[in-house]
From Swiss-Prot:
Pathway: Glycolipid metabolism; diglucosyl-diacylglycerol biosynthesis. Keywords: Carbohydrate metabolism, Glucose metabolism, Isomerase, Magnesium, Metal-binding, Phosphoprotein. This is Phosphoglucomutase. Belongs to the phosphohexose mutase family. GO terms for biological process: enterobacterial common antigen biosynthetic process; glucose metabolic process; purine ribonucleoside salvage. Its EC number is 5.4.2.2. It catalyses: alpha-D-glucose 1-phosphate = alpha-D-glucose 6-phosphate. The keyword Cytoplasm does not apply. InterPro entries: A-D-PHexomutase_a/b/a-I, A-D-PHexomutase_a/b/a-I/II/III, A-D-PHexomutase_a/b/a-II, A-D-PHexomutase_a/b/a-III, A-D-PHexomutase_C, A-D-PHexomutase_C_sf, A-D-PHexomutase_CS, Alpha-D-phosphohexomutase_SF. Its cofactor is Mg(2+). One of its GO terms (molecular function) is phosphopentomutase activity. Binds 1 Mg(2+) ion per subunit. Catalyzes the interconversion between glucose-6-phosphate and alpha-glucose-1-phosphate. This is the first step in the biosynthesis of diglucosyl-diacylglycerol (Glc2-DAG), i.e. a glycolipid found in the membrane, which is also used as a membrane anchor for lipoteichoic acid (LTA).
Amino acid sequence: MKALWLENINESLVKDFYETQTEEEQNAGFEGVLSFGTAGIRSTFGLGPARLNAFTVRKVALGLAQYLNHNVDDASVVIHFDTRFLSKAFSQEMASVLANNGITAIISDNYKSTPELSFAVRHLQVNAGIMITASHNPKNYNGIKIYNEKGGQLLPEASEQLSEYINSIETPLNIEKGDFNAFVENGKIKYMSNEVTESYKKEVKSLVGSIDAHDAKVILTSLHGTSLPLVSDILTELDYHNFVIEKEQSEPNGNFPTVAIANPEDEAAFTLGKQLADKTDAQLIIATDPDADRLGFIERYGDNDFRYFNGNEIGLLLMKLRFQDLTEDSTPQYMIKSIVTSELAERLATSLNVEVNDVLTGFKFISDLIEHKQKDDDKQLLLAFEESHGYLAQPISRDKDAIQMVPLLVKYKNLLDKNGITFKETIEDIYENIGYFKDRTLAPTFEGKAGVKKIESIMSQFRNEQVFSICGMDVLKIEDYHVGEVRDMITGHTEKLTLPKTNLIRFIFENGFIALRPSGTEPKIKLYFSLEVENIDEITQQFEANYINNIV
């Protein structure tokens, strides 16, 4: 098989990557096949069925074409791509395969963000959307996310159906794609008009309203991704000009030269921003990840001190400040959060008389619930968020949307600044009045086949053993979403969980929870801690050492 792939290497788009890889890395591309998971496909570049290249991308496109042609007539699809290596080329490969199978592909001629893709699907009323991105993964990764006609990522049932079509294609080397330029000429491939972007901007500006105070200077960085110049254009059109772009870090570049990892969850990504803040006397640094679905920020205050806010804290701030922003609107509000989001979010929502809705991890579940909630005209969304720095205030899109959140944060920062208040003081006020939960997320990595077995062993051991105490804390309940049951560890009584089944276990204590699940896109196990304790770091270290690393 490898020889046949090598014969076609010039058409693979990844020849240069392959030739710089070690023999072990090259061989890994022929061990198994890429699987379309709950978050689509994400992988490193390389030759072979287990890596991203022109042929495996065509395979996904053909599977999607077969899936759509089976379910709808005259299907159409929007395709966007980010600033990563080969993103544009992959988008054209997919468009050609779709067009060759009778599906109209609407593509962008320049990089776009994930929230723009979600909005475009809804705005253009197409049957599906494709986003070529690996979000905040390292530079040697890329990926494909598929969206349904509502603009949300595919739910498990649809994802499984699509996966069956993709997996049924045995020889991706033989997939016909037709001529891209010919399809453009005959209209099967169309370039998206600027009207879509303008409509999206209009919706975002409507959400923000106006930015009346302008004294707080803000630094923006796209981490070499897609949020600029769109965000700066929106701010300018809102007549807010007191921002500075970190130019070196905002050049579109899939090599991500100024950061080790282009992830606003990583405080190290703000190094250049902090240096620029020192020079410009800016009070806030906002960073978005490469496909602009996630954001993070650091506040500069006092005598040149900096405060980094984690994903839960940003969500809490947005909840409180947006609630205050909507005080003149008497419409009942609801919020949505994932089950691994801070316990403090529910307490804050309850104190604000806001309805709380829990969903599984993955913004697709938030999107699906919003779709149902939107049919209820009596309630409006306050905020939907996950602890992993993903937020949505106005459901103009159906995925995490950093583009709409940046100008909202700028507005709130200036309103606070006008009253001599900082984000730091605001979050401390929440802790003082609502409770001081400390939240941490760890993601130990276990590479290769041995890593897969290790992660399976960890989940199996926690699932099959009776656990009454963890790190000195009594376990009150164990929620096992894989079997769909919650067990009361005091009475032994079990009940059915109401949320869909997924590979996640959550241990409930009197003072919070610890949860764990395998990552859907990387060889990692995600560990979530939300506890009302002082020694959170001691607990996380003890848990990882005694309950994760010791399991064989």
